[in-house]
């Protein structure tokens, strides 16, 4: 608890205007949430793999009662409209939508459960519950961000796109053929679980490496340019106009091949 609060303090010292931090739904989650609030954290993410759960209901209710309305509570992950409706009723302000779509996640393979992220966004947005929706998983490029926003997401979460940058965790190493790379691992991988809790169970992530990308600023600039261009193709100046103007179609595998560079 103290170590996480210290990380929040350090983020503010580095000039962060807003800091969010994650808690679970068991053990000392409420103590942790209170500690984070005292450190100035105004965004608490209640983060579990299967968010539509009775333990989530208990945690959201307790955190809301303890911290009041001054804290923004993010919760997830979920994949259905039913889950979106329930989590908002339990006290969530924003929802992380997507199960098993991450580049280093193998939940769908190991458990047989999960829904394509874009479908989940459509379904949760269609419930019209008024909560902020965050597309989480499967975002590979700026085009995927545009699609998620057009489907109803207010934000996206990205991991692999930022992995390999100077600002991401891990050391740069050089491969036998002289290329620079950085380690990238899922929090549900065996290696990550052993590091943070000393043991592992239900391995639903992998460890890999990605190409070294330099400063995160360059990555964000390219994403920003792609998103702006994407809005222009739908004649949109705002996200609301994008959702109104964009049209979705069913695409074949041949169409997907044509959509990528194929020289």
Predicted segments, located by residue:
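Hydrophobic faces of well-ordered beta-strands that scaffold small-molecule active sites
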Residues: 17-23, 44-46, 73-76, 95-97, ...
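Alpha/beta catalytic cores of nucleotide-metabolism and tRNA/nucleoside-modifying enzymes
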Residues: 22, 68, 89-93, 112-135, ...
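Catalytic cores of alpha/beta
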Residues: 28-39, 73, 78-97, 140-154
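Active-site beta->alpha loop and helix N-cap motifs at the rims of alpha/beta catalytic domains
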Residues: 16-45, 49-50
């Amino acid at each position: 608890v103290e170590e996480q609060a210290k990380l929040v303090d350090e983020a503010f010292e580095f000039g962060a205007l807003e800091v969010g931090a994650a808690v679970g739904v068991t053990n000392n989650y409420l103590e942790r949430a209170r500690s984070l609030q005292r450190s100035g954290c105004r965004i608490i993410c209640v983060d579990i793999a299967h968010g539509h759960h009775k333990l989530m209901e208990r945690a959201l209710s307790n955190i809301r009662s303890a911290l009041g309305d001054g804290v923004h509570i993010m919760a997830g992950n979920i994949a259905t409209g039913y889950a979106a409706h329930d989590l908002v009723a339990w006290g969530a302000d924003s929802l992380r939508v997507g199960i098993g779509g991450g580049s280093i996640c193998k939940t769908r393979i190991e458990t047989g459960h999960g829904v394509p992220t874009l479908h989940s966004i459509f379904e949760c947005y269609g419930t019209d519950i008024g909560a902020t929706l965050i597309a989480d998983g499967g975002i590979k490029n700026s085009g995927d961000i545009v699609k998620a926003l057009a489907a109803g997401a207010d934000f996206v979460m990205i991991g692999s796109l930022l992995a390999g940058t100077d600002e991401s965790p891990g050391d740069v190493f050089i491969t036998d053929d002289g290329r620079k790379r950085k380690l990238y691992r899922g929090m549900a991988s065996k290696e990550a679980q052993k590091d943070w809790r000393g043991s592992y169970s239900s391995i639903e992530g992998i460890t890999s490496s990605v190409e070294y990308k330099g400063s995160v600023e360059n990555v964000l600039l390219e994403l920003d340019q792609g998103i702006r261009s994407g809005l222009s193709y739908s004649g949109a100046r705002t996200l609301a106009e994008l959702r109104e103007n964009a049209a979705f179609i069913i695409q074949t595998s041949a169409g997907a091949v044509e959509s990528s560079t194929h020289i």
